[in-house]
Structures are given as C-alpha cells and as structure tokens.
C-alpha cells in the first residue's frame, strides 16, 4: 500500500516561529515538498510571520545598471558574462550625473532603496571613488537608502563605501556551495561569502540571496536559507532563474509558480525577521500568482532589472493596493 503522508499543521509551525522557535531543516524541506494543494495554507502561515514583523508594509527597491556586460566572469546564468551570447546592451560606467538622476527616478517610482549595480569581478579604487561621488550627492539631496552591488570588495573599499553613507551591499550566494562549480569556474562560493562578511565588518548592512532553479536539489534550497541565516543577511533577494537565450543555462527548465511560492514561504519561515525580496524572474516565473508572493515576502523591485524587463511601476503599485498592503515610505 502507498504510504499516506501526514499533513503538517503549517499554522502551528508559523506561531512557533513567531514565538522565536526556529524551524529545522526537515521542516524547511517539508514546505518545499508539500503537495501543491497545500500552497494556500502554507502562504497563509507564512503571512502570520510576515505580518508579525512587517505588518502590511511593502518595501520598493529600484536598480540602476551603471555598467552593463563586459564581465570577465563565466557565470552560466548571466547574460553579462564573458561567455554569454545574449544580445544585451554593453556599456562602460554611467556618469555620476546619470547615477544621481536615477535616484530621483527611484523616488518617482516610490522606491525607498536605490540599488547601484555594476558588472565585473571587482571594482578598481577609481571606480569605487566614482560611485562614492554619486552616493554623496544622493545622500545630500534625498532620503533614499543606498545599496551597492559592485562585485568583490577588499576591506578598504568596504570601509570607504560605509563612510560615504552606503547603507547596504548586495552580493548574492547565487546557489548552494555544492552546486557552485556547475554554474561558475572563475571564482568560488567562498569568495562570495568573504565579500558578504567584509561588507558586514565595515558596518554595511549585508544583502545576500540566491537564484533558484539552477539545478539545485530541494535539500540544497533549504540549506541555502539556513546559510543566509548563518550569515545574518539583513535583506534576502529571492531570484528565480530566467533562462536567457545565449547563456549556458538557456535550456534549464524554469520553476513553476507554485514552486516559487514555496521557496518564498520557506525563506520566511527560516529567516522570519529579515527583508525577503521577490527579485529577478518575479514576473516571468510567478506570473498570475505574483500577489500571493507578498504573503511571504515584504519587498520587491519596481521597474526593470539588470538586463530583463520588469512590469510598469503602476502595475506594482496597483498590486500592492489591491492586496490591502501599503508601500513603505522612503525614509532612513
């Protein structure tokens, strides 16, 4: 006879988390492996945790791609890598004026965090100073939180960014340590962890997440969440692979909308007090169930991503309003 799996009490598990009882890896795997018919119960349970810590607030973030393509790394998922044949715009650094203009566009889009992103392995000291010049002007003229994502950092560069007023530094783990060699050969998983730690040591809030759907196992997905817990990442972007044509992963099967929802819920259970952001691949992977994602997550990007299009800001604002949620005001 086929063994009947005992149905979990997801709501009880959520209240345990609210009472600061951490879930186990087995609990996290159970969320990911739950029958699709349970997904609404799981999202409702995740919302108990999300609402306890964040109420109905949704944080909006906006990206500016200040340097596109021209990257020497061989990350298999990335359209900007040296091995990518994807037809993307390639350009060197935007001027400081353009970066500052982007900050004011972020405000028009009701974003509270402005993310300055550049392709490449690591920035030169001259490039860091270029970013710092723009950051200082943005800090003088707006109340935006500023996040930077410039590649690997050394201690001096991290300290300079912190002194300039950079609030957050993004450096994703991308995938599980044991899966890393299958997506990149030009740097290691430990290299990425090192930069997250350097940013934190400099006093910058660490932002680190993953791209789900790159061949990792269910168990590895759960372990990624616990690794981010260990690193104490304050903000966790959950990206879902967009299999871009011209990249080595172009044929990779993308996750279903329900699989994406389970990832978001699992991440909320494991990291209950952290900002969970639905990031790249939100529109293409979650599709018509995007609104449900915000029952676990409390943050999204508004507008376009690095090389892929997002939906119009008005659509995001409308989605948030329709849910009865509120956009978190831009404030430090």
Swiss-Prot record:
Which residue ranges does UniProt annotate as crossing the membrane?
Answer: none
GO MF, one example: 2 iron, 2 sulfur cluster binding
Return the Pfam families for the record: BATS, Radical_SAM
Q: What is its EC number?
A: 2.8.1.6
Q: How many cofactor units bind, and how?
A: Binds 1 [4Fe-4S] cluster. The cluster is coordinated with 3 cysteines and an exchangeable S-adenosyl-L-methionine. Binds 1 [2Fe-2S] cluster. The cluster is coordinated with 3 cysteines and 1 arginine.
Q: Give the top-level enzyme category.
A: transferase
Q: Which UniProt keywords apply?
A: 2Fe-2S, 4Fe-4S, Biotin biosynthesis, Iron, Iron-sulfur, Metal-binding, S-adenosyl-L-methionine, Transferase
| Record bears the keyword S-adenosyl-L-methionine | yes
Is Transmembrane helix included in the keywords of this UniProt record?
Answer: no
Q: Which residues bind [2Fe-2S] cluster?
A: 115, 147, 207, 277
The superkingdom of the source organism is Bacteria
Q: Which reaction does it catalyse?
A: (4R,5S)-dethiobiotin + (sulfur carrier)-SH + 2 reduced [2Fe-2S]-[ferredoxin] + 2 S-adenosyl-L-methionine = (sulfur carrier)-H + biotin + 2 5'-deoxyadenosine + 2 L-methionine + 2 oxidized [2Fe-2S]-[ferredoxin]
User: Where along this sequence does the record place binding of [4Fe-4S] cluster?
Assistant: 71, 75, 78
Q: Which InterPro entries match?
A: Aldolase_TIM, BATS_dom, Biotin_synth/BioAB, Biotin_synthase, Elp3/MiaA/NifB-like_rSAM, rSAM
Q: What are the names of the required cofactors? A: [4Fe-4S] cluster; [2Fe-2S] cluster
Which parts of the sequence belong to the Radical SAM core domain?
53-282
State which pathway it belongs to: Cofactor biosynthesis; biotin biosynthesis; biotin from 7,8-diaminononanoate: step 2/2
Q: Which GO terms describe its biological process?
A: biotin biosynthetic process
Q: Which PANTHER family match?
A: BIOTIN SYNTHASE, BIOTIN SYNTHASE, MITOCHONDRIAL
Q: What does this protein do?
A: Catalyzes the conversion of dethiobiotin (DTB) to biotin by the insertion of a sulfur atom into dethiobiotin via a radical-based mechanism.
Q: Which family does it belong to?
A: Belongs to the radical SAM superfamily. Biotin synthase family.
Q: Which NCBIfam families match?
A: bioB
Subunit comment: Homodimer.
Tell me the protein's name: Biotin synthase
- Species: Bacillus mycoides (strain KBAB4)
Gene transcribed to yield this protein = bioB
């Amino acid at each position: 006879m086929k063994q009947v799996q005992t149905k979990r009490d997801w709501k009880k598990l959520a209240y345990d988390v609210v009472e600061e009882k951490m879930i186990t890896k087995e609990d996290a795997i159970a969320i990911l492996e739950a029958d699709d018919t349970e997904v609404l119960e799981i999202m409702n349970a995740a919302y108990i945790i999300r609402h306890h810590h964040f109420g109905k607030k949704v944080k909006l973030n906006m990206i500016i791609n200040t340097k596109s393509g021209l990257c020497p790394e061989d990350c298999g998922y990335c359209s900007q890598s040296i091995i990518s044949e994807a037809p993307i715009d390639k350009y060197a650094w935007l001027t400081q004026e353009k970066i500052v203009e982007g900050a004011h566009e972020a405000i028009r889009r009701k974003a509270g965090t402005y993310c300055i992103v550049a392709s490449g392995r690591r920035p030169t000291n001259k490039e860091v100073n270029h970013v710092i010049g723009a950051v200082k002007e943005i800090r003088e003229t707006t109340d935006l939180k500023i996040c930077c994502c410039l590649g690997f950092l050394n201690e001096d560069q991290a300290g300079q960014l912190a002194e300039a007023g950079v609030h957050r530094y993004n450096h994703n783990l991308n995938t599980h340590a044991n899966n890393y060699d299958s997506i990149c050969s030009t740097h290691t998983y430990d290299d990425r962890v090192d930069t997250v730690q350097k940013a934190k040591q400099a006093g910058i809030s660490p932002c680190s997440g993953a791209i789900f759907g790159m061949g990792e196992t269910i168990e590895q997905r759960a372990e990624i969440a616990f690794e981010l817990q260990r690193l104490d990442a304050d903000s966790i972007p959950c990206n879902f692979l967009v299999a871009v044509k011209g990249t080595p992963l172009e044929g990779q099967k993308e996750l279903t909308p329900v699989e994406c929802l389970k990832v978001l819920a699992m991440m909320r259970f494991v990291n209950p007090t952290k900002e969970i952001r639905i990031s790249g691949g939100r529109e293409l992977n979650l599709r018509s169930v995007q609104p449900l994602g915000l029952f676990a997550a409390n943050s999204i990007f508004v507008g376009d991503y690095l090389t892929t299009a997002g939906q119009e800001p008005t659509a995001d604002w409308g989605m948030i309003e329709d849910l009865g949620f509120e956009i978190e005001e831009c404030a430090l």
